[in-house]
Each structure stands twice: as C-alpha cells, then as structure tokens.
Amino acid sequence: MSTSKKIKQRLKDAGKRFWAGDNISDFIEDGEKQQLIDELAPKFEEVLQGLVIDTENDPNSNGTGKRLAKMYINELMAGRYEPMPVATAFPNDSIDRYEGMLVVRSELTSMCSHHHQIVRGVAYIGIIASEKLIGLSKYTLSLIHI
C-alpha cells in the first residue's frame, strides 16, 4: 500500500477530514514525508510529460519531478505536514522590556487550497507587549499554518 493511502486510512479511521488546507501532521509517522516525496516525484514527472516537456534531454527539466515533490511537501504545503511550532512565553520584565506595540513583518509563500497555485504576500503582525511575550520568530513560523 502506498504511503499516501496509509496516511489517508489513518485519517479515516480517526474520523478526521483531510481537505487541502488541513494540518495532517499528527497522522504522519517518522520517515513518511520523504516517502511521500518519493511517491509524488514520478507523478509530477508524468504531469511534465503530459505538458510535452522533454525531461530527459532538457537539463533545466531533468529531475524536476523530484524538485516539485520536495517543494510541495517541504515548502508550499509545509503547514500541512509539520506540527504548529511550540511557543514559549518569556517574561517581559527586565530593564530593557518591550513597551507599546511591536510589529513583525513577514513575507509569506503558501498555496491556494482551491487552485493549488503559489500565493505570495506580506503579513504585518502587531503585538501589544505585556508581562510575557513569545519569541518574535514564532509569529512568522505560525503563518504557514494559516
């Protein structure tokens, strides 16, 4: 049975949906992300062949099926296959504490769950400082899960 079918079966057995925008990381076992990439690579190769692209002789297209599989799993849809980052709150009580509003600018590359095409944008996250703050990088890392 293929890795994707095993994961789908686990999701179905647990009564969980697996729509394009859903995070399914709790149902992926160690090593299965790489197995999904290996499973997808020849399928992406078939898509390229269907588009009449010479993936054997065109040096730019040689190995592109594998690169596409890696890009979808590890980058464009990373929020689907990776758990949400753990955010630790730190005391904001030192002499150099933050006061007022902090603004985090984050460039975002994701995927439209309807057209499955790349979406790029910029998010500005405003944080009102209080007694505790989470690390600023966690706000950016959390964006891939939205």
Question: Residue locations for each model-derived region?
Answer:
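Histidine/lysine/aspartate-rich catalytic loop segments that bind and position anionic ligands
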Residues: 125-142
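Conserved small/polar residues in nucleotide/adenosyl-binding loops
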Residues: 144-146
